[in-house]
Amino acid sequence: MKRTYQPSKLVRKRRHGFRARMATVGGRKVIAARRARGRKRLSA
């Protein structure tokens, strides 16, 4: 059986990166919530 996590920096950036988040309303809310919480890293 193949493992579920097959790391790829490119896929990680495209799916969960800052620009991917900013592209949708929901994603912008995620960034805002993480800023409000004081997260050191906002996105992948």
Curated annotation (Swiss-Prot):
One of its GO terms (biological process) is translation. One of its GO terms (cellular component) is ribosome. Pfam families: Ribosomal_L34 (PF00468). InterPro entries: Ribosomal_bL34, Ribosomal_bL34_CS. GO terms for molecular function: structural constituent of ribosome. It comes from the Bacteria. Keywords: Ribonucleoprotein, Ribosomal protein. Belongs to the bacterial ribosomal protein bL34 family. PANTHER family: LARGE RIBOSOMAL SUBUNIT PROTEIN BL34M, MITOCHONDRIAL RIBOSOMAL PROTEIN 34 FAMILY MEMBER. This is Large ribosomal subunit protein bL34. It comes from Methylobacterium sp. (strain 4-46).
